[in-house]
Regions:
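Non-catalytic structural scaffold of enzyme domains
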Residues: 1-224
Length: 224
């Protein structure tokens, strides 16, 4: 059994967290294929949207995972999650599901409340995450109010500086939301601090993505 992890952000903290969550869910016997191309996210950040060349390279990574024998693929980056949506027909045709890391997190946010705060350091992640929350809310027959928490100047800071800015940003919206979504997987290490500080449910994508990856493998009969 092989699971492919497709990264467009290669911070060590993110990779460590994702692999920890994946291993916890699918076990240590699974072979992990790690495919990484940070130039994709860099291009998206610079352009402010997912360019056709960035999308093409990401789709190429999916196909490389298939060529390497992956049984399921986890798309790590929320900024390019809509690319994963666009190739679901192809994924079904080759029999290799492509799982978005943030899809079920967004569904859980809608289940937990009508007012959803979205924290992000990149506008290119904030907007796709909001779009996903709105889409799944419609599919669930619910309406949600989205509260932006774009944190300027936080991208690239060390963990302690980032933690401080994130706590400040969450504090500004805490009275206006029922649940907070961390739009980037690399934010996950601040989840406990935010919950303890403000008593609001805080969701991060690697945990949900790993669970969905497990379900995809179970549906193929590869896991009990």
């Amino acid at each position: 059994m092989k699971a492919a992890l497709v990264y467009t952000s290669t911070t060590p903290e993110l990779i460590e967290l994702v692999e920890k969550e994946v291993t916890k869910n699918i076990g240590t016997d699974a072979e992990i294929i790690s495919l990484q191309d940070p130039s994709i996210l860099a291009e998206v950040r610079e352009a402010g949207y997912v360019t056709k060349t960035a999308a093409a390279r990401l789709i190429g990574m999916y196909m490389e995972a298939v060529a390497q024998g992956a049984d399921a693929i986890l798309n790590i980056c929320s900024s390019v999650g809509e690319v994963a949506d666009s190739v679901q027909t192809a994924a079904a045709y080759v029999g290799v599901p492509i799982v978005r890391i943030d899809e079920d997190m967004c569904k859980e946010a809608v289940r937990l409340g009508k007012r959803v705060g979205v924290l992000a350091t990149l506008a290119t992640t904030l907007e796709p995450t909001k779009n996903t929350i709105s889409r799944v809310a419609r599919a669930m027959g619910k309406h949600v109010e989205l509260v932006d928490g774009l944190i300027d100047g936080a991208f690239g800071l060390n963990q302690e500086e980032f933690r401080k800015l994130l706590l400040e940003a969450a504090g500004k919206i805490k009275d206006d939301v029922d649940v907070i979504v961390l739009a980037q997987g690399s934010m996950a290490y601040v989840e406990e601090d935010l919950h303890e500080a403000y008593g609001i449910p805080v969701l991060y994508s690697p945990r949900f993505g790993a669970i969905e990856l497990k379900k995809a493998l179970q549906e193929k009969g590869m896991l009990a």
